[in-house]
């Protein structure tokens, strides 16, 4: 259902701190205020239960606003009325499980609306940090099945070194694992469906049969070289999302953030990887953008300017669909 809204101004979203056994109990200096009794592994920036922090809809969840005003948020070209992307920051103190996500077809077979293709942008990485993405050449599903039972699956994983600023694309069907040493901004289809293959002895459910069904031996996963343009760096531009990085001092207009193919304009998210900014425009109160916070820019947002208030490193994330 769409409400009677005709225009929505940019608004900041409060994060949701999600407990994970492999996470940290203290996220400083990245996040100062954490509401949890146990280790935090993920900070959801655009989860359905995240609450709007500014503007006339402050206090509502993101899911509630999408139910009320999906077309105003997404634009006329959107293929669905649901929130298209889940954006999060991942803090891994221990190795995550070796896992795989289903594609759209397989997810629907098991009663879910969509699968999960994702990407990781390294906000920070220690020397020697690594992630596992895909399987080594020659590995078969039988090999994977045997190694799951023997606890030796790691030896068949394709291991990538990761540095700050790297972008890793992980399409559905890719066996993968996040390891300690990096802090990752993840953009993904709005689905939290994971099939665990191997979990390092932790007492969590495994999904071996479904994970083998979901696994593709060859995928398009891997590091994506950045494309440097005059006013931005395109980190990735694939079927479900586009990530761009903007640096620079002074003011930047909302029009200058658009890419050439965004006609008509759709929903966008602005994430402050570092530094801070402020969004101002006619008809709405200024919206502050502190470090590691996110602002949603609805398709119908009025024109605005974003001011760099100090070392602003801006990541713009947009859902991709035919326009």
How would you name each of these model-derived features?
Residues 82, 90-95, 104, 114-115, ...:
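Ligand-binding loop in jelly-roll beta-barrel domains
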Residues 157-169, 281-301:
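Short acidic-glycine-tyrosine-enriched beta hairpin
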Residues 148-150, 156, 167-169, 175-223:
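An exposed, glycine/acidic-rich loop-and-rim segment of catalytic or binding clefts
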Residues 87-89, 96, 118-121, 159-160, ...:
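His/acidic/aromatic-lined binding-pocket segments of jelly-roll/cupin-type domains
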Residues 1-139, 200-221, 243, 316, ...:
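Transition-metal
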Residues 195-267:
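C-terminal amphipathic alpha-helical segment
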Residues 146-153, 276-278:
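Short, structured beta-strand/loop micro-motifs enriched in basic residues and often containing a Trp
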Residues 122-144, 233-235, 248-266, 277:
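Short beta-strand/loop turn elements enriched in aromatics
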């Amino acid at each position: 259902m769409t409400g009677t809204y005709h225009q929505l101004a940019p608004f900041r979203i409060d994060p949701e701190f999600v407990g994970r056994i492999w996470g940290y109990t203290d996220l400083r200096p990245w996040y100062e205020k954490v509401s949890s009794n146990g280790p935090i592994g993920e900070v959801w920036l655009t989860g359905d239960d995240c609450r709007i922090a500014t503007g006339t809809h402050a206090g509502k969840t993101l899911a509630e606003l999408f139910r009320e005003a999906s077309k105003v948020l997404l634009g006329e070209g959107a293929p669905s009325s649901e929130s298209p992307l889940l954006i999060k920051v991942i803090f891994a103190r221990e190795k995550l499980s070796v896992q795989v996500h289903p594609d759209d077809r397989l997810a629907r077979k098991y009663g879910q609306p969509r699968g999960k293709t994702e990407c990781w942008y390294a906000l920070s990485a220690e020397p020697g940090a690594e992630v596992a993405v895909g399987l080594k050449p020659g590995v078969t599903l039988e090999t994977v099945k045997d190694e799951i039972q023997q606890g030796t699956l790691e030896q068949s994983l394709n291991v990538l070194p990761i540095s700050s600023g790297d972008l890793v694309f992980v399409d559905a069907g890719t066996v993968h694992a996040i390891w300690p040493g990096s802090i990752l901004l993840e953009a993904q289809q709005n689905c939290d469906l994971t099939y665990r293959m191997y979990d390092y002895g932790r007492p969590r459910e495994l999904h071996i049969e479904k994970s083998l069904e979901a696994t593709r031996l060859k995928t398009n996963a891997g590091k994506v070289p950045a494309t440097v343009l005059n006013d931005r760096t395109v980190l990735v531009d694939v079927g479900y999302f586009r990530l761009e990085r903007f640096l620079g001092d002074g003011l930047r207009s909302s029009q200058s953030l658009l890419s050439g193919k965004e006609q008509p304009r759709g929903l966008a998210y602005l994430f402050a990887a570092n530094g801070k900014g402020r969004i101002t425009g006619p008809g709405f109160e200024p919206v502050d953008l502190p470090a590691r916070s996110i602002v949603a820019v609805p398709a119908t947002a009025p024109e605005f300017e974003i001011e760099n208030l100090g070392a602003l490193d801006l990541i713009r994330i947009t859902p991709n669909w035919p326009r």
